Amino acid sequence: MEKYHVLVVEDDKEIRDGIEIYLKSQGYEVFKAADGIEGLEIIYREEIHLAIVDVMMPRKDGIQMVMEMRKDYDFPVIMLSAKSEEVDKILGLNMGADDYVTKPFTPLELLARV
C-alpha cells in the first residue's frame, strides 16, 4: 500500500523537523522544504497528497506558494502561522488553504487536521 505523501514547507528547521518526526511515526511519507520556492519544486516532481505550509517564509511566502500551486494542483493545504487574528485566517483560506493552524500547536492538534 502506498504511503500518504505530506509536504512540510516551514522555514524554522526545528518546527519542520519536529513535524516530520511526528508524521513519520504515524506512517506518513514526508517531504520537506524551507521556503515556497523549494516547496513548489517538490510539488512539481513528487506526488503530494497534502501540504502543510507556513505563511511567513523568505523568498516565497506560503500565501504566494499556495496561490501558484492552486493553478495546477488541488490537494489539501494546511496553513501554519503565528498570526492568529481572524483577518489572517480568512486571508489564508481565501487564498486557497483548506485549514489554518496557529502556532504554537500540539502534534495531536496537527494530526487531527491531517
Map each language-model feature to its residues:
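N-terminal/domain-start alpha-helical segments
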Residues: 1-114
